[in-house]
Amino acid sequence: MFTYLAHASPLHRLNPAMKLAAIAVVALAATAAFDPFIPAMLLIALWLTAWRLGRVPFLQMLRWSIPLALLPLPIALFNALYTDLSRYAHPHILWHWGIWTLSTEGLWNGLGMGLRVAVFVAASLLFIATTDPTDFALSLVQNLKIPPRFGYGVLVSYRFLPLLKREYETIRLAHRVRGVGEGQGLRGWIEKTRRYAIPLLAAAVRKSERTALAMDAKAFGALPQRTYYRQMVIRRGDVLFLLAWLLYVAAVYALALHFGLAHLQWVPG
């Protein structure tokens, strides 16, 4: 799910640093909003951006939408059941049993919290799916002036999970060849975790050591100036993309405030 989709699209051609700035604008906008309206509008815009500008296939978008809808459900339900109703003069109680109380206000808050989580996941997914890891590292170093050691460290981290996934598959196939079965139920899951944890940890440590030695051998950060084969430049389209998101977020906030739908964390209740 969280993998780079390598194909040509306007979103793929954007400068990663400016794309990251736009994603940061979306994340900050969602962080400040505790109502469902603002996160829902941001989520719709992210979905359309991935589909039209990122040219992500529609079926792929649907596959992404299923976990994107299921992941926030427990968070939304928890917040709906445990909303502090003392803040409301006349809360609308829908259901009550023991310590659990479900109200209209609680559902509104829970839905807002769940949609906020969905926005964070969708924004991260959009960035990862449309950003080449190498371009991202180069952009961090060249455009954002991050030290090369940290910039390429981000690149290594970016590619670390796929490496661990392949290592996991190798270990699983090796166990199958040796006739080691996978037990069922909780006991089987614990046993499988024990068998896989140590080899995966050893592989992670080994790869980290090799990466650190390779970075030291290339003298990252030792010289004041570095030359690059590929230059990452910020074009007009990159700036327009960031401005478009800023204007959209401002418009959504203006609508929410105008119609009394906004519940912002910096505004006293």
What are these regions (language model features)?
Residues W64-G179, G183-L186:
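Juxtamembrane/interface alpha-helical elements of multi-pass membrane proteins
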Residues M1-P36, I44-L53, R166-G269:
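Transmembrane alpha-helix interface motif
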Residues F58, A80-R87, V249, Y253-G260:
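Transmembrane helix-loop junctions and nearby membrane-interface residues
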Residues P36-F37, P57-F58, K145-P148:
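Membrane-helix interface segments
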Residues A8, H12, V56-Q60, W97, ...:
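Membrane-helix interfacial "entry" motifs
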Residues L42-T49, D135-L140:
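Hydrophobic transmembrane alpha-helix segments characteristic of membrane transport
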Residues D35-L43, Q60-R63:
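Short, aromatic-rich membrane-interface segments at the entry and exit
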